[in-house]
């Protein structure tokens, strides 16, 4: 019964985690059922599409065939790029798919014909001719219910707040930012906007308005899907406080003490995972107090199940402000919840959605602004042929970073030459941005605070962003190349194969160590010591007092030092290059964007290109070619999740 699954697995159409589920379904469906094989193949297609982030599939033959055909084309292109394609097997997949994706079989996926696996308490649920795993159907219903109860309420606060009374003379909010403050006093809001549009800025002034004019003792939670994104939100709020006048701060010491001491949370840390049951301690039955304010950032990164868990833990009278960029990539896991919220007719009608469209990071005369705007509108990219340079002309440009220029370098048609191109460019990049890190990170003096700051800033000067993790265009291959080129292997540490100067990123939430997915830092050694430490800039609950502690976690200023041996080596990765997904919520002074080099690749799409280029604060280098870039911009990633249907 799993022949089709094995074929898809061999050709990278599906992940192996579905094997057990399909075996369980096979056991639950009677062998006497005439069409069992075709139904099993349909369920296999569904799981394959879940791997792409969908939560549901249509039981309409025409719609499903169109969706599946796009996946076949995309995976085939990816296999060609990696030189792993077997055309005869792709043809076999097409033939088997054409047989099972037929209305006569699709119409049998219902509670009557398949009562053993379809129904309210079974593996699958069918709703309005769409098939869901029960957990996704449950999550979408909980989200719709929570949005209904949290975003239809009006708060009758008769507050007349003028932000100008608390800011310095040279500070202004845009009209849309002022609308956020004014509306947010009496409504919960969804706020969308690109980088530099001031989402966090206007929410800070909204917070000031609510705290200044209320006798409620609010519990305020800064929440994001990753540790990095949560830290960035706290940093953004702290930096925006510089716009507030000292006079106003002195008049409202208690208010600003609250804001200064706000804590940031990943969603997992906020909801508290029970170590025994692996379930969240905060949930529908045990909610946060109603005098709570939730500021949720990078919402596009939150998957459907996590979004559901977060919203159901919030009481009706709570204040909720959800922020994100509608044009960024959706979550790594299934769903596209933030996008669905922005399309909600109820939220639009009720005035809960505000889009900020004035960027203070990218002025309208910059190349980045023009390219990002064209990408989002799906426009034809107009650029002169001489814009695309040969890779041998690659160099680190010494230009005015405020102009955010873009430099384009092109692939050729040969795979072997493209590998050489990537290595050639990464060699120059590493010499500029990573080689000096090795000296700076070896034998550091903890009393030299300036050196710590310089080291951390150096690690952020240049970042390589890749669409994929595997393959010669992928972050893993690039990271290994740069490590072998840069590290000094004569400097041994107490952790095998780990050396000072390596840029690293945490890939798993670790509550015990207070390290979270997305936390990034550098491996360092101290004077006269071979102990390797992971140095990361973050606040932490587990170590709040300054001072060196031998062989233990310690804090110096804004930096935490973790003995690297405390961190499981499968929980931390090299991060000279990271995937574009991982880069969400971050920005870097200079970026090198390495795109897939085949048209039709599943990771060559509008959202991934937009997300990548908007991580820059300065120079952007793109490795692709004109046709690849245009085709990627034309390909908009669409996920089926049907939250409000």
What residues fall within each predicted segment?
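Intrinsically disordered, low-complexity N-terminal extensions of AAA+/P-loop NTPases
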Residues: 1-82
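Residue-level signature of catalytic and energy-coupling elements of molecular machines
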Residues: 62, 143, 266, 297, ...
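Interdomain "pre-motor" coupling segment immediately N-terminal to P-loop NTPase/helicase cores
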Residues: 84-159
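Pre-Walker A segment
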Residues: 125-195, 204, 210
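ASCE P-loop NTPase helicase motor core
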Residues: 178-181, 186-399
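Residue-level recognition of short, solvent-exposed, well-ordered loop/turn junctions
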Residues: 289, 315, 496-500, 516, ...
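Conserved helicase motor core of P-loop NTPases
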Residues: 327, 331-504, 510-513
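C-terminal accessory regions
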Residues: 519-645
């Amino acid at each position: 019964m799993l022949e089709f699954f094995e074929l898809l697995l061999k050709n990278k159409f599906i992940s192996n985690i579905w094997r057990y589920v399909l075996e369980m379904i096979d056991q639950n469906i009677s062998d006497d059922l005439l069409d069992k094989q075709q139904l099993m193949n349909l369920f296999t297609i569904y799981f394959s599409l879940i791997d792409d982030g969908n939560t549901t599939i249509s039981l309409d033959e025409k719609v499903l065939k169109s969706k599946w055909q796009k996946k076949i084309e995309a995976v085939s292109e990816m296999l060609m790029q990696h030189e792993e394609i077997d055309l005869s097997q792709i043809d076999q997949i097409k033939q088997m798919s054409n047989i099972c994706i037929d209305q006569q079989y699709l119409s049998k996926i219902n509670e009557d014909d398949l009562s053993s696996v379809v129904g309210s308490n079974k593996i699958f649920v069918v709703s309005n001719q769409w098939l869901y795993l029960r957990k996704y159907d449950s999550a979408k219903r909980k989200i719709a219910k929570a949005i209904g109860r949290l975003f239809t309420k009006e708060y009758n606060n008769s507050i007349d707040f003028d932000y100008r009374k608390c800011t310095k003379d040279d500070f202004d909010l845009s009209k849309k930012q002022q609308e956020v403050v004014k509306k947010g006093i009496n409504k919960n809001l969804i706020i969308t906007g690109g980088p530099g549009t001031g989402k966090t800025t206007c929410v800070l002034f909204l917070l000031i308005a609510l705290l200044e004019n209320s006798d409620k003792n609010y519990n305020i939670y800064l929440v994001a899907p990753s540790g990095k994104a949560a830290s960035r939100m706290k940093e953004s709020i702290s930096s925006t406080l510089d716009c507030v006048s000292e006079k106003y701060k002195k008049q409202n010491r208690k208010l600003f003490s609250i804001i200064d001491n706000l804590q940031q949370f990943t969603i997992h840390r906020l909801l508290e995972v029970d170590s025994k049951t692996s379930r969240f301690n905060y949930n529908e039955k045990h909610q946060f107090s109603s005098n709570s304010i939730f500021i949720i950032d990078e919402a596009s990164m939150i998957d459907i199940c996590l979004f559901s868990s977060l919203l159901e833990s919030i009481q009706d009278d709570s204040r909720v402000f959800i922020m994100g960029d509608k044009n960024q990539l959706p979550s790594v896991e299934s769903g596209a919840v933030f996008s669905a919220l922005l399309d909600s007719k109820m939220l639009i009608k009720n005035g809960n959605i505000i889009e900020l469209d004035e960027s203070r990071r990218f002025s309208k005369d910059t190349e980045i602004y023009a390219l990002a705007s064209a990408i989002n509108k799906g426009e034809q990219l107009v650029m002169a042929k001489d814009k695309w340079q040969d890779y041998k002309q690659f160099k680190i440009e010494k230009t005015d970073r405020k102009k955010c220029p873009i430099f384009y370098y092109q692939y050729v048609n040969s795979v072997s030459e493209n590998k050489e191109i990537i290595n050639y460019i990464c060699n120059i990049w590493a010499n500029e941005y990573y080689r000096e890190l090795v000296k700076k990170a070896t034998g550091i003096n903890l009393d030299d605070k300036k050196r710590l700051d310089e080291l951390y800033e150096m690690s952020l000067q240049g970042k390589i962003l890749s669409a994929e993790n595997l393959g010669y265009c992928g972050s893993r291959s690039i990271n290994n190349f740069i490590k072998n080129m840069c590290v000094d292997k004569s400097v041994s540490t107490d952790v095998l194969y780990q050396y000072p100067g390596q840029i690293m990123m945490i890939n798993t939430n670790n509550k015990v160590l207070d390290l979270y997915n997305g936390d990034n830092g550098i491996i360092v050694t101290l004077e006269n010591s071979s102990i390797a430490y992971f140095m990361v800039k973050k606040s932490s609950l587990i170590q709040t007092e300054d001072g060196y502690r031998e062989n233990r976690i310690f804090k110096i200023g804004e930096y935490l030092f973790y003995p690297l041996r405390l961190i499981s080596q499968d929980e931390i990765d090299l991060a000279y290059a990271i995937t574009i997904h991982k880069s969400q919520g971050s920005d870097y002074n200079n970026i090198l964007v390495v795109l897939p080099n085949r048209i039709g690749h599943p990771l060559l799409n509008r959202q991934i290109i937009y997300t990548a280029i908007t991580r820059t604060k300065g120079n952007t280098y793109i490795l692709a070619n004109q046709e690849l870039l245009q085709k990627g911009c034309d390909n908009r990633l669409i996920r089926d999740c049907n939250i409000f249907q």
